[in-house]
Structure formats: structure tokens, C-alpha cells
């Protein structure tokens, strides 16, 4: 990868993780809307936002080319399921007072990224990277052994998003066209659920306040912009390098949870956080050292 692509990847990764870091504040504004309904709005409005974006940028030719490759279309169905599951779990966690565990999941994610990079992409581990991954695993095992609890939400978020990044990197499609097809795969299910199954005080948009409907529609922008940045970064950077930036998002989430939303980390969570933070410190120092050697 050339220097220009790398610079673009870095900027896109920074933008993606910053927006994701402050995204919980948006979902807290609509905490009274069920998580599954918010997910359907994310899918529906993201699809229409992508249609508008592709129309403005005149990139429908790329969509036509993509539609001629059935293998990529079906792989995008897999990535759609992965990202849809990740979205649902994240929304539920934030609006059910598990923002700290959500942040833990995204602290773990860069370490899962380098693990998947080694297993599926042939990327080699350096010694310090091995140490970082081992410490992260130890943190989860200590929580399980000592406190009898397992960070299910954190692990679910970490692995679903890591596999999503891996699949998108293997498909190697342009960010916007890939996002359009992913939301197109999810659109029928989302529409059937929202308009045919969901029955809550907020599920009927015609009866909602205009302010609520605008917030629900904004889910498309909140979802699409950082995801486009991420998928753009994933095609320009090594998966292990991409993991380097992900501490930005969970750090912002952690600060939001503790400072603004009154979540207090228990002893079990703090043990795991401590291991993960040490692992990330080692990972970052190793990355900086390696970069300087180059």
C-alpha cells in the first residue's frame, strides 16, 4: 500500500472511531424506543441515505459492476448479518446501562483484529503482540474464574465487529457500494418488522412527535458516516494497523458512561479493564517502535 492510501486510511479510521465514541449520546436521546425498533430505523434510513449519496456522487456504475459478481453479493449478506447483530447488541447495551461493557468490547476488538489477521490473512505476530493478546485473554479468564461472570456483551461486540472487518477486507468492495448492498439485504426484514410486527408507543411514525421521527431518521446518518469511514479505512490499512486506532472510540464511551451517565464499574469489570489497558499499552508501544524502525 502506498503512502497516500495509508494517510487516507489513517484519517478515515480516526473519523470513524471518534464518531462511534460519541454515538451512545445519540442513542441515549431515544432510550425509550425499543432496541429492535431503533435497529430497523438504522437499516431503513441508512439504505435511503446511501441511495442519495450514490446518486449525488454518481457511482451507480460501481453498483452495477458489483451486482455482476454474485459471490461478493452473497458475502455482503454475511457481512450484513454481522454488522446488523453488532448494531442491535450495541443499542441494547447502551440503553440498558451497559455502556461500560460496550466500551470494554471495543477495547478488546483491536486485539481480536490482530488475532484474526494472523489466522485468516497470514499477518505475523510480533512478540509484543503475542503478549498483548495473552494479557487480554487472561483478563477475561480472571473475571470468569474469580467473579464467576463473563463479559458476554463485550465479547459479542468485539468478535462480531472484528469478523465484519475481516469479511469486508476479503470482499474488497468500495465502501459506499458495499454499504448499500448490506442495507439492501437487511431492508426487507427491517421493513416487515417495523411496519408489520412491532407494536409499541413509538412504532407508529404517524403518531410520533416530529422531533422523535427526525431523531429516528438521523439513525441513518449516525450509522452510515462512521461505517463508511471504517470500511474505507479497512481497504487501505492492514487489519492489525486498523486495530491501533480503535482505543479512541471505547475511551470516549468509557468517559461518557462514567462522567455523564452514572455507570460505576464493579470489581469484576475493573480487573478485566486493567488487563485490557495494559495489553493495549503494550500493543501501542510495539506499534510505535515498529513504525520508527521503518
Curated annotation (Swiss-Prot):
A Pfam family the protein falls into: EamA
Membrane topology annotation: Multi-pass membrane protein
Keywords for this protein: Cell inner membrane, Cell membrane, Membrane, Transmembrane, Transmembrane helix, Transport
Protein's UniProt keywords contain Plastid: no
Domain EamA: 18-145
Highest rank taxon of the organism: Bacteria
Subcellular localization, as worded in the UniProt entry: Cell inner membrane
Side of membrane Periplasmic, spans: 35-37, 96-99, 147-149, 198-211, 262-270
Residues passing through the membrane, by range: 12-34, 38-60, 73-95, 100-122, 129-146, 150-167, 180-197, 212-234, 239-261, 271-290
InterPro entries in alphabetical order: EamA_dom, RarD
GO CC aspect terms: plasma membrane
Residues in the Cytoplasmic compartment per record: 1-11, 61-72, 123-128, 168-179, 235-238, 291-294
UniProt keyword Cell inner membrane, yes or no: yes
Family per similarity comment: Belongs to the EamA transporter family.
NCBIfam families hit by this protein: PRK15430.1 (NF011959), rarD (TIGR00688)
This protein's name: Protein RarD
Taxonomy of the source species: Bacteria, Pseudomonadati, Pseudomonadota, Gammaproteobacteria, Enterobacterales
Amino acid at each position: 500500500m502506498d503512502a497516500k492510501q495509508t494517510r487516507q486510511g489513517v484519517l478515515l479510521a480516526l473519523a470513524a472511531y471518534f464518531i462511534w465514541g460519541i454515538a451512545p449520546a445519540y442513542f441515549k436521546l431515544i432510550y425509550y424506543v425499543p432496541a429492535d425498533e431503533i435497529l430497523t430505523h438504522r437499516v431503513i434510513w441508512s439504505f435511503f441515505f446511501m441511495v442519495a449519496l450514490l446518486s449525488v456522487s454518481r457511482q451507480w456504475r460501481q453498483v452495477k459492476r458489483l451486482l455482476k459478481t454474485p459471490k461478493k453479493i452473497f458475502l455482503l449478506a454475511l457481512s450484513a448479518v454481522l454488522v446488523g447483530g453488532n448494531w442491535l447488541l450495541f443499542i441494547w447495551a447502551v440503553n440498558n446501562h451497559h455502556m461500560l461493557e460496550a466500551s470494554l468490547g471495543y477495547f478488546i476488538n483491536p486485539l481480536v483484529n490482530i488475532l484474526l489477521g494472523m489466522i485468516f490473512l497470514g499477518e505475523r505476530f510480533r512478540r509484543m503482540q503475542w503478549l498483548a493478546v495473552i494479557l487480554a485473554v487472561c483478563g477475561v479468564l480472571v473475571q470468569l474464574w474469580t467473579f464467576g461472570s463473563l463479559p458476554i456483551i463485550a465479547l459479542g461486540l468485539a468478535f462480531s465487529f472484528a469478523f465484519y472487518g475481516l469479511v469486508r477486507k476479503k470482499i474488497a468492495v468500495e465502501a459506499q457500494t458495499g454499504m448499500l448492498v448490506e442495507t439492501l439485504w437487511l431492508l426487507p426484514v427491517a421493513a416487515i418488522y417495523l411496519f408489520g410486527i412491532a407494536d409499541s408507543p413509538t412504532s407508529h411514525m404517524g403518531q410520533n412527535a416530529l422531533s422523535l421521527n427526525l431523531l429516528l431518521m438521523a439513525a441513518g446518518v449516525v450509522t452510515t458516516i462512521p461505517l463508511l469511514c471504517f470500511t474505507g479505512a479497512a481497504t487501505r490499512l492492514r487489519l492489525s494497523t486498523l486495530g491501533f486506532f480503535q482505543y479512541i472510540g471505547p475511551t470516549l464511551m468509557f468517559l461518557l458512561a462514567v462522567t455523564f451517565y452514572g455507570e460505576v464499574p464493579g470489581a469484576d469489570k475493573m480487573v478485566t479493564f486493567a488487563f485490557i489497558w495494559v495489553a493495549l499499552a503494550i500493543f501501542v508501544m510495539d506499534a510505535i517502535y515498529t513504525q520508527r524502525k521503518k
